[in-house]
Amino acid sequence: MNWSQIESPSLDDFETLARDAFASLPEEFRALVGDLVFRVDDFPDEDVIKDMELESEFEILGLFQGPDLASGEAGQSHGLQTMIFLYRRPILDYWAEHEEKLGDIVRHVLIHEIGHHFGLSDEDMHEIEDASD
């Protein structure tokens, strides 16, 4: 492999990775979110950094935004579009520091962002990851 010719994945590449990873998840898990929009940015915006009290824009890999089944909001958008934000630069930084495949990291972020939003346990999320391998 000629490493001198390889470029880092673009925002569009990340969106494709996210769509592929999401499609590999079990149907019952994907059904939690309905019509999901993927948004890939290099970093979270200043509001997210402030609201989450982050010290660095590298502290967050993704963010779920949307109505929540646990509070009875399912099917009631209240103007919120169901979205997953993936932050390309923090994910690439994480990838550089760990011996994991980039697609596996993106899938993990998707599962955990959706899972935490809907109150799934870590054990539930590990089972979903295992089922999607």
Where are these regions (language model features)?
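Active-site rim/adjacent substrate-binding subdomains
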Residues: 1-105, 117, 121-126, 132
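Catalytic glutamate of the conserved HExxH
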Residues: 109, 113-117
